[in-house]
Amino acid sequence: MGVPKRRVSKARKNKRRSQWKIAAPKLVSCPHCHQLMIPHRVCKNCGYYDGRQVVNME
């Protein structure tokens, strides 16, 4: 069984948890309007995805 033999110190616990980081979102430019967008998503500015308009932007 996975039972700890000794108490885990604060330093050891914090060293282990130091790897828990949030990554910045990867951004690419939209080929239609050249605004930054998340890849494989519909562009929030123009509504285009994969070379065609899928959302009507007013």
From Swiss-Prot:
Look up keyword Ribosomal protein and say if it applies. yes
Alphabetically ordered keywords of this record: Ribonucleoprotein, Ribosomal protein
**UniProt record, GO biological process:** translation
**Which SUPFAM superfamilies does the UniProt entry name for this protein?**
Zn-binding ribosomal proteins (SSF57829)
| MF term (GO), any | structural constituent of ribosome
- Note one Pfam family from the annotation: Ribosomal_L32p
| Gene Ontology annotations for the cellular component aspect, listed alphabetically | large ribosomal subunit
Q: Which HAMAP family match?
A: Ribosomal_bL32
Q: Mind telling me which NCBIfam families this protein's record contains?
A: rpmF_bact
Q: Which family does it belong to?
A: Belongs to the bacterial ribosomal protein bL32 family.
- Protein name, UniProt field: Large ribosomal subunit protein bL32
Which organism was this protein described from?
Answer: Carboxydothermus hydrogenoformans (strain ATCC BAA-161 / DSM 6008 / Z-2901)
Gene (name only): rpmF
